[in-house]
Amino acid sequence: MCGGAIISDFIPPPRSRRVTSEFIWPDLKKNLKGSKKSSKNRSNFFDFDAEFEADFQGFKDDSSIDCDDDFDVGDVFADVKPFVFTSTPKPAVSAAAEGSVFGKKVTGLDGDAEKSANRKRKNQYRGIRQRPWGKWAAEIRDPREGARIWLGTFKTAEEAARAYDAAARRIRGSKAKVNFPEENMKANSQKRSVKANLQKPVAKPNPNPSPALVQNSNISFENMCFMEEKHQVSNNNNNQFGMTNSVDAGCNGYQYFSSDQGSNSFDCSEFGWSDQAPITPDISSAVINNNNSALFFEEANPAKKLKSMDFETPYNNTEWDASLDFLNEDAVTTQDNGANPMDLWSIDEIHSMIGGVF
């Protein structure tokens, strides 16, 4: 047993024979035998030799025409029509052809175009969609990143569309399809105006001003000796009243300013021009207390300034020089001897001359 079948009951199929034409077409030999018999009968019924002789006799011999005889070639080929090559015109489309398959295809394309033109967008603007709760969401696809960029949720569709336009211009530039192209035109016009304003030439200052101003600019400084500014240290020998004996003249008769502190004299300034310039006399400062004199020459705190004391009473330098001679020792000795011809002043007279201001 093999697989539940009884081998003794298994009958093998007969051995297949070689495939021949007789096996495929068994009636072929019968047809061949019948055709041979019919051919014999036909040959007996028809005499092919007699028929050939009859046909040959019935054939007309055209050799009677002699080629040497004169004959007109035009008469022979007179009935022959020449060949004419003409283009056949295209058949006009009839009313029946309008209902054909070709006509149906054309009408179908036109109908699709009309449908696409009449079809409205689901949303009025591109790149936005409405949420179930009423707000509008905007998003755009970035081809460089290959992903969609979320732009946010907005209350109105117009705000969402403007956000989409801004992102589209940033990603695709001037080729972007936007919802508000007129804003793009306005932005381009504004950029052009800004560029035009930047390209306008700026007025440059005239490097050569009028010659009159150049000539008159140094009139007041032509006799000034500009030197390096230095802090002035007191070099003058002050007496017990804090005033100088005489006034020296500067170069060319002009006086130099060298005071580094504010002063209350008639022609002093806060500008220091030279170390070698003579010091202007602080005549009106004669009555100031010696304790305050340190403020004039204190280098540690040069920013302190005293209040200006202006006097209306005029004075004369020659009178001051003459009045101060009594302080010298020679003047005292001559005064004792009574040989000084000059009238000496006392301290009370000095106070009255100053005006009684201490």
Curated annotation (Swiss-Prot):
Primary localization: membrane
Protein's UniProt keywords contain Cell membrane: yes
SMART domains noted in UniProt: AP2
Cited InterPro entries: AP2/ERF_dom, AP2/ERF_dom_sf, DNA-bd_dom_sf, ERF_plant
Pfam families per the UniProt record, alphabetical: AP2
Subcellular location: Cell membrane; Nucleus
CDD domains on file: AP2
Gene Ontology CC: nucleus; plasma membrane
Signal peptide from the UniProt entry: none
Tissue specificity as recorded in UniProt: Highly expressed in seedlings, leaves, flowers, siliques and germinating seeds.
Control of this protein's activity: Ethylene-responsive transcription factor RAP2-12, N-terminally processed: The N-terminal cysteine residue of can be oxidized by PCO1 or PCO2, thus preparing the protein for N-end rule pathway-mediated proteasomal degradation.
PROSITE patterns, per the entry: AP2_ERF (PS51032)
GO BP term (any one): response to hypoxia
Induction, per UniProt: Up-regulated by hypoxia but not by ethylene.
Superkingdom, taxonomy of origin: Eukaryota
Annotated DNA-binding residue span(s): 124-181
One Gene Ontology term of the molecular function aspect: transcription cis-regulatory region binding
Subunit structure: Interacts with ACBP1 and ACBP2.
This protein's domain notes: The N-terminus (1-13) is important for the regulation of the oxygen-dependent activation of the transcription factor activity, an internal region (123-177) is required for the interactions with ACPB1 and ACPB2, while the C-terminus (343-358) is required for positive regulation of gene transcription.
Function, in words: Transcription factor involved in the activation of hypoxic gene expression and in ethylene response. Partially redundant with RAP2-2. Acts as a downstream regulator in the ethylene signaling pathway.
Other comment: The N-terminus qualifies RAP2-12 as candidate substrate of the N-end rule pathway for protein destabilization. The oxygen-dependent oxidation of Cys-2 prevents hypoxic gene expression via the destabilization of RAP2-12 in air. When the oxygen concentration decreases, Cys oxidation is prevented and an active RAP2.12 accumulates in the nucleus.
Recorded family membership: Belongs to the AP2/ERF transcription factor family. ERF subfamily.
Protein name (database record): Ethylene-responsive transcription factor RAP2-12
Lineage, top ranks: Eukaryota, Viridiplantae, Streptophyta, Embryophyta, Tracheophyta
